[in-house]
Amino acid sequence: MLDVGLLGAKSGLSASVLTDKSAVFREFKGALAEQFVQQQLRAECGIEPHYWQNDSARSEIDFVFQSDMDVVPVEVKAETNTKAKSLLLYCRQFQPRIAVHCSMNDYACQPLPYGINTTLVDLPLYAVSQMN
């Protein structure tokens, strides 16, 4: 499904679930944020995102896409939570030049710790359409 509105409608949740910040919304907002990012990547950026998980299926990256000769991992969080263990594991294993963390945080750009040769770009959810 490529439309965040359709996802919301198909969920059958009432608007009060969103405005009251109920437990159901806390569970649903991650899927909603991921759907929004996928919609923006495809419709606004012309990017065909893919999914990655490691062999043990314990780590996953929400989206990966190719940009020139680079594969760019994208992790999506619906809050200001900056813990992205799977993204760190992916970067440690594959050493991409750039990794993107989409969340409710402000813009930031910083090298990853632990000697990982990757620049982490924090991109606010509202700015995902600027990814390309």
Annotate each language-model stretch with its function.
Residues M1-N132:
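A cross-kingdom feature that marks ATP-driven nucleic-acid transaction machinery
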